[in-house]
Amino acid sequence: MGFDLDVEKKKENRNIPQANNLKIKVIGVGGAGNNAINRMIEIGIHGVEFVAVNTDLQVLEASNADVKIQIGENITRGLGAGGRPEIGEQAALESEEKIREVLQDTHMVFITAGFGGGTGTGASPVIAKIAKEMGILTVAIVTTPFYFEGPERLKKAIEGLKKLRKHVDTLIKISNNKLMEELPRDVKIKDAFLKADETLHQGVKGISELITKRGYINLDFADIESVMKDAGAAILGIGVGKGEHRAREAAKKAMESKLIEHPVENASSIVFNITAPSNIRMEEVHEAAMIIRQNSSEDADVKFGLIFDDEVPDDEIRVIFIATRFPDEDKILFPEGDIPAIYRYGLEGLL
């Protein structure tokens, strides 16, 4: 039996912003996407509604999302897509009306998934296409497989990215392999996947709260839309600094993250935000902003926001940026550093 949207919608209010009736939704697609939004709900994101989408009824029942959508009831009978993206795609097409119903009156949607499996890889492009057709600002933040997950998952992920980028405004790819480079060698596999979930959380939270949280230097929906509408592949940078040089440390970490696989200075548009306690000094704001500027093109359209947040420790500053509108997005989605590994797996001709 599938989920009824009205029955399964949770009663609790997650502070969806009422100003201008702005509605932002985060859709987790497939097993990894459902896990990611469960993590986001646990940690918290201000002003968004969570939607879980899956072909696997058992996994969907474990979701804490505000809304749950079982797709492809006739095709999969609630048993999942079996790692086949074509089944995930057919399932989403079968349930198109359910998806459209959930997306009504939405201004911005985040689609998050782990690519390489069946439901997330196959259904995400369909959901994105529907959202774009409805005039919704559509942003996808997806992970690609660890190499140890095998060549077939990598191949499916690449093919899925090629489909997805046709139907989103902005596509942010997070490489699990690059993420692993930032983890200690003795990290447990469970913790590695948790780190991937946390990175997805930071990305969605960082972008959405630019809009939903009132800033001291404010960025509104129009600012974000100007950077992310029809922007193509994008780069996300996140940094946290502590102590005496917290501003410099946060900005440098954001710009020098191993997740960044392409020079940021090639971007035509950048939006960045500083989240800090109210004790932040003017010189710290200037220092962080200059590091971002120095790593950007002189001609780039750069937008800046500042949010005071009581939840940030007194000795800490957080910096996030999104860089968009690159001349060659293939170099972002399929960087040359990945090509030798891809060839090792016998995937010649895909790129």
Curated annotation (Swiss-Prot):
Any one Gene Ontology BP term: cell division
Cited SUPFAM superfamilies: Tubulin C-terminal domain-like (SSF55307), Tubulin nucleotide-binding domain-like (SSF52490)
Keywords: Cell cycle, Cell division, Cytoplasm, GTP-binding, Nucleotide-binding, Septation
GO cellular component: cell division site; cytoplasm
Subcellular location: Cytoplasm
Binding residue positions for GTP: 31-35, 118-120, 149, 153, 197
InterPro entries: Cell_div_FtsZ, Cell_div_FtsZ_CS, FtsZ/CetZ, FtsZ_C, Tub_FtsZ_C, Tubulin/FtsZ-like_C, Tubulin/FtsZ_2-layer-sand-dom, Tubulin/FtsZ_GTPase_sf
Record has Transferase as a keyword: no
UniProt keyword Nucleotide-binding, yes or no: yes
Molecular function via GO: GTP binding; GTPase activity
Chief location bin: cytoplasm
SMART domains: Tubulin, Tubulin_C
Family named by the database record: Belongs to the FtsZ family.
Subunit structure: Homodimer. Polymerizes to form a dynamic ring structure in a strictly GTP-dependent manner. Interacts directly with several other division proteins. Interacts with FtsA.
Function comment: Essential cell division protein that forms a contractile ring structure (Z ring) at the future cell division site. The regulation of the ring assembly controls the timing and the location of cell division. One of the functions of the FtsZ ring is to recruit other cell division proteins to the septum to produce a new cell wall between the dividing cells. Binds GTP and shows GTPase activity.
Protein name per Swiss-Prot or TrEMBL: Cell division protein FtsZ
Native species: Thermotoga maritima (strain ATCC 43589 / DSM 3109 / JCM 10099 / NBRC 100826 / MSB8)
